[in-house]
């Protein structure tokens, strides 16, 4: 995925014609607005020849005015892929469950996989490798941290979450990352100590 992203980034900056998604449609559900997410998905999909359709909070009352099952079936009939930026993580799970087309998790309150893919891509670009990176995240133990922990179950790293004691990440996600025995995971409440443990510092 990272190699493909690097190749596409090069083609984009060189203004090369790349119409892989010609005659394809992306439905973008934004229950939670974001300028960066909208601009990146919409620009990228249209550059690759597709059409991106924006649906804001007032267009769909997902899980309220509109049943998620019905919305999922509607998009599956008219579109080729869905990107959803939602609050409730269960909603993205249900959306994918009833969908017959790919569903991209643009963000939920639980995790933010696209952000972490971008972060690890940036690390790879600047450092030339993602082999055992030493990373410290400073901030609340939020959806960003949960996605880092999920990535730490797949590639080896030293990951430290430095957060206030009352704002720790989800205990179950921490334990799964530790139990995977792939990465070194630790939780710190001392910023000065934490920065000594890593080469890469991330904060919100």
Residue ranges and their predicted role:
Residues 16-18, 73, 80-151, 200:
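Anion-binding alpha/beta catalytic cores of soluble intermediary-metabolism enzymes, centered on
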Residues 48, 98-100, 155, 181:
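Short, structured coil segments at secondary-structure junctions
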Residues 155-178:
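NAD(P)-binding Rossmann-fold cofactor-contacting core
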Residues 181-197:
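Short acidic low-complexity segments
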Residues 198-204:
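Residue-level detector of conserved catalytic or cofactor/ligand-binding positions
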